[in-house]
Amino acid sequence: MMKKIAVYLFLFVSMVSLGNVKDPFKDEKFDSAYKNIKEIFPGDFRCRFIIKQVLLRSFHEDNKNTEMIDNFDSSLTTYGRIIQEEGLFLNEKDPVEVTTQYYAKYCTVPEEKWLDSFESPALSKYFNSIKEKYPRK
């Protein structure tokens, strides 16, 4: 009986917490950026995958959805390991940082005016860290 109560309580709490998560695709700016990734963030398939994850993660970071942030960190971790399996950035210990290094080296960083108009502190922070850590020559 206690197990059933615990399971129902867990399911109820999960539904309530997921019900509070804001849908990024109902946000006009986010939806437009996501649909136009190829134009805004040109690059290869890896660049597009990474930026999709970063956009989603940034949206949830801006909206304080910690569970969703963890999900996208997990996705970036897996992708960083895949990139390393292919022989890139082997000296890096953090797989999420591998995706950041890949993005910095091979992908497009949007113009500052686009970032300002997008109004995402988390996304701006991501690109500012790329500019600081991995300046383009």
Residue ranges and their predicted role:
Residues 71-137:
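Compact alpha-helical subdomains of small soluble proteins
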Residues 1-20:
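Classical Sec-dependent N-terminal signal peptides that target proteins to the secretory pathway
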Residues 12-14, 61, 91:
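Generic detector of N-terminal low-structure segments
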Residues 29, 34-84:
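Short N-proximal segments of mature Sec-exported proteins
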